[in-house]
Design a protein with these regions (language model features):
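Glycine-rich acyl-CoA binding loop
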Residues: 103-108
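Conserved GNAT acetyl-CoA-binding A-motif
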Residues: 118-129
Length: 167
């Protein structure tokens, strides 16, 4: 069982709700480079949809659409599915740090903390994907212990590169 409070040593973590949509929208708007590689641009409606979408054979009980807060400021969003794509894995569907908080080690701290929390919950790996060509995302993920697993998947509008981190 994943314990949300154990996912950060430096920030308050909680599930985001519909009342957080404006803050989440401001955060994603601060990162236009992401959407240049991974269209379309986010909207408030798409964020609300992302809060509840899960893969086939998964339920909302497996989904953690989380906000990381420094006091009252939302500094990062994480969309996490436990037990996907297999029972030993967790899938990060989305991770973004507010642009004003980037370059300070905050994203790496969060990735390290969530990796520890996911491992404590009994999972053996984290999988995710980034939009091919987005060198900023690629460098960040490689720096934080993710490796390419050799898969590239075409999705509407772009291709993603799948990576994993063994815990």
């Amino acid at each position: 069982m994943l314990k949300i409070k154990n996912l950060s040593t430096n920030y308050q973590v909680r599930k985001l709700t519909t009342s957080d949509v404006n803050r989440a929208f401001e955060l994603v708007q601060s990162n236009p480079t992401y959407f240049a590689y991974c269209p379309p641009q986010a909207t408030r409606h798409s964020i609300l949809e992302d809060m509840k979408v899960v893969p086939a054979n998964k339920s909302l009980d497996d989904k953690y659409y989380l906000g990381f807060f420094d006091d009252t400021k939302l500094i990062a969003i994480l969309d996490l599915i436990m037990g996907y794509p297999d029972d030993e894995s967790a899938w990060i569907g989305f991770f973004m740090v507010d642009a004003t908080s980037q370059g300070k080690g905050i994203g790496s701290d969060i990735i390290n903390d969530i990796s520890d929390g996911i491992k404590v919950a009994g999972f053996k790996r984290i999988e995710l994907a980034y939009a091919k060509g987005n060198s900023q995302s690629e460098r960040f993920l490689l720096k934080n212990g993710f490796i390419k697993d050799g898969r590239e998947v075409a999705v509407p509008g772009y291709t993603v590169v799948v990576m994993e981190k063994k815990l």
